[in-house]
Design a protein with these regions (language model features):
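Aromatic-enriched
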Residues: 1-3, 166-195, 199, 342-344
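N-terminal cofactor/phosphate-binding cores enriched in small/glycine residues
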Residues: 5-95
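Active-site diphosphate/adenylate-binding microenvironment
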Residues: 10-13, 18-22, 36-40, 349-431
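Glycine-rich phosphate/diphosphate-binding loops that line cofactor/substrate pockets in enzymes
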Residues: 11-22, 63-68, 93, 151-156, ...
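Structural signature of the thiamine diphosphate
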Residues: 23-24, 66-77, 82-103, 126-179, ...
Length: 449
């Protein structure tokens, strides 16, 4: 056969990014990644976005991923460049955002010697990434990048970190980038166990007070349309988590509100009184459950989730189903029937009438007025938030529909997220209006952007 011309690891990395369909990366150069920056400079298919701080870079990549469905790609240097990613990796890990982050590393013979700008970034981030690895041999580079994109995108999405020693990257090797992935220990299940699903749907039909709980998994799987159809057919009311907001349009007559400590009275009462809680794509985080033994005390619980580890971790469930939310909901749509929920819906309407979401305004104009005006003005906006009071106003009052997306730090609650997230969302969606809503504190945390 013909002998392929060898290329450096830096060249292979750029080739790999193109093969993976990457058109934008968020990068901040430094000594250990300068050769990669040079390779990126020599081509024009991939745009490189330069922030002022690596934390802002990873938040921007995160929102880019959330709003486009692509993988967010980061490139930072070793040492402080890498450690500045930590909060952003944890944010993405909690909220299931696919990222591939490349960190520079000192040459192999210096690793472990406390060399200049050397940290064990794989060790530091082990608990906040889906996978992390140092490329110790040039011949492993292509395979590792291929696996990283596969791991980030599939199953429950998440951030992957690849640490690149400088000498490995300058070494010559094969120009080939693998076409397939063969990971023995990682086989994410997506298809639905039909026996379990039919059992769950039978329970749904029998229930007197059924309730859907939709989490961020419905939005991540982009199953909103199918889920809304299921809700329309069954006539079963819906509550959502903050990350699940928009699983059905927030102006839908069967949408009660968010549950949890920052949720609506009626939504929390519905969870307490329902006899079947049919939950899709949620982790049952402490913000929504309160005391675990008092959560949905009268209900049988169905839990559909892509992540085996999320099922029965916090709440004991009666019917566990490990599946991709979009596949599960599409199958449900084929089999569901209308449920008799008239009395149950009247009870919920009564709670809503007695305890609506209200807000005292001191002076002439309050946060709610601003958000409601925004609802009227913008049809297709992406709304990003920081974390705190203003975030709760947005998650309670902002209209989220098929055309309006909410981008917020849910699991970790990262102040400083909203502004760089808006930049990342706009880069991914140049034709859409992007609105960042921030508090005075969060705004100052990444104000350098």
């Amino acid at each position: 056969g013909k002998i392929l011309r060898q290329i450096t690891g830096n060249k292979l990395l750029v080739r790999a990014l193109k093969e993976e369909g990457v058109d934008t990366i968020f990068g901040y150069p430094g000594a250990c990644t300068i050769d990669i920056s040079d390779e990126l400079y020599r081509q024009d298919e991939i745009k490189v976005i330069l922030p002022r701080h690596e934390q802002a870079l990873v938040h921007a990549a995160d929102a880019y991923a959330r709003t486009t469905g692509k993988v967010g790609v980061c490139l930072v240097t070793s040492g402080p460049g890498a450690t500045n990613l930590v909060t952003g990796l944890a944010t993405a890990n909690y909220d299931s955002v696919p990222l591939v982050c490349f960190t520079g590393q000192v040459a192999r013979h210096l690793i472990g010697n406390d060399a200049f700008q050397e940290v064990d970034i794989v060790g530091i981030t082990r608990s906040i990434t889906k996978y992390g690895v140092t490329v110790s041999k040039r011949e492993d580079l292509g395979r590792i990048i291929k696996e990283a994109f596969y791991i980030a995108r599939t199953g429950r999405p998440g951030p992957v970190l690849i640490d690149l020693p400088k000498d490995v990257m300058s070494e010559l090797g094969s120009p080939e980038y693998p076409e397939t992935v063969n990971l023995r220990g990682y086989k994410p299940n997506t298809s639905v166990h039909m026996g379990q699903l039919k059992r769950a749907l039978k329970m749904l039909n029998k229930a007197k007070k059924p309730l859907f709980l939709a989490g961020g998994g419905v939005n991540i799987a982009r199953a909103n349309k199918e889920f809304t159809e299921v809700v329309n057919i069954t006539n079963v009311p819906v509550v959502t988590t903050i990350m699940g907001r928009g699983a059905v349009p927030t102006d839908h007559p069967l949408f009660i509100g968010n549950l949890g400590m920052h949720g609506a009275y009626a939504a929390n009462m519905a969870v307490s009184e329902c006899d079947l809680l049919f939950s899709i794509g949620t982790r049952f985080n402490d913000r929504i459950t309160g005391k675990l033994h008092e959560f949905a005390p009268n209900a049988q619980i169905v839990h559909i989730d892509i992540d085996t580890a999320s099922i029965s971790r916090n709440i004991h469930v009666h019917v566990p189903i490990v599946a991709d939310a979009k596949e599960a909901v599409a199958k449900m749509r084929e089999y569901v029937e209308p449920c008799e929920t008239k009395e149950w819906l009247e009870r919920i309407a009564q709670w809503n009438a007695e305890h609506p979401l209200t807000m005292k305004v001191h002076g002439s104009i309050g946060p709610r007025d601003i958000i409601e005006e925004m609802n009227r003005q913008f049809d297709d906006a992406i709304i990003t938030t920081d974390v705190g009071q203003h975030q709760m106003f947005v998650t309670q009052y902002a209209e989220i529909t098929e055309k309006k997306q909410l981008v917020t730090s849910g699991g970790l609650g990262t102040m400083g997220y909203g502004f760089p997230a808006a930049i990342g969302a706009k880069i991914g969606n140049p034709d859409r209006t992007v609105i960042a809503i921030s508090g005075d504190g969060g705004m100052q945390m990444n104000i350098q952007e």
